[in-house]
From Swiss-Prot:
Gene Ontology MF: a single term: toxin activity
Superkingdom as given in the UniProt entry: Eukaryota
Record function comment: Probable neurotoxin that inhibits ion channels. Is toxic to mice.
Primary site of residence: secreted
Domain LCN-type CS-alpha/beta positions: 25-80
Name of protein: Toxin Acra I-3
Any one Gene Ontology cellular component term annotated for this protein: extracellular region
Family membership: Belongs to the long (3 C-C) scorpion toxin superfamily. Sodium/Potassium channel inhibitor family.
Expression tissues: Expressed by the venom gland.
Signal peptide: 1-22
InterPro entries on file: LCN-type_CS_alpha_beta_dom (IPR044062), Scorpion_toxin-like_sf (IPR036574), Scorpion_toxinL/defensin (IPR002061)
Organism: Androctonus crassicauda (Arabian fat-tailed scorpion)
């Protein structure tokens, strides 16, 4: 029983460390030529969002809240 509790605590700590590490990555939602955010349907890693982000000048993006999010996208590069 004690081993199970210890294992659970370790798993929770590693989960928290992972979420804290990823939370500090700046970015932005890119906008199309009409000023709309790009929609996406597959949350997380998403090739269409990566392609959109590359058009906006950054290397990586993903689907978050059913909209494409680009890591390190600066305000000046949000619109095409």
């Amino acid at each position: 029983m004690m081993k199970l509790v210890l294992l659970s605590v370790i798993v929770i700590l590693f989960s928290l460390i992972g979420s804290i590490h990823g939370a500090n990555v700046p970015g932005n939602y890119p906008l199309d030529s009409s000023g709309n955010k790009y929609p996406c349907t597959v949350l997380g890693d998403n090739q269409s969002c990566i392609d959109v982000c590359k058009k906006h000048g950054v290397k990586y993006g993903y689907c978050y809240g059913f909209k494409c999010w680009c890591e390190y996208l600066k305000d000046k590069n949000v619109s095409l």
